[in-house]
Amino acid sequence: MYAQSEKNKGEVKQKKMEACLEAANIYASFATKEGMLPRPPYIAIGLFACELYMKALLMKRDPKGCYAHTHNLLDLFQALPALDQQKIEEACENHFSEKPLLDFLAENAEGFEKWRYDFETKEMTISHFAFLALINALRDHCKN
């Protein structure tokens, strides 16, 4: 085995990040499609898009392109640099009138897994406006 050059490592990191963003954009566009009702499949896919957006940001910010291997939205958000957290919170601010973003993330930390298996639980709720605001804030922040 040979050592990768720094240039090759950078190219691999960039390709992984771009693939992650592409997947997030596909899932987000499906989950936020006009006229869609907030049903479990759309919510699960939207929360997965949020996860991928945060992982793409973590890859972008980390010199080695590393990210946390978890579905936990709160853990991923807290792993982001403070400036990224601040910008995302500011973008969501007007849509989180009932509770702060961190509370929403804590309540939906394992949302992707829970909403995939919604038939196993009795009752699940999510603020549709907050859900859409988070997806849009993350998508917009990843463009910068």
What are these regions (language model features)?
Residues 1-28, 32-33, 62-144:
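Long, charged low-complexity segments
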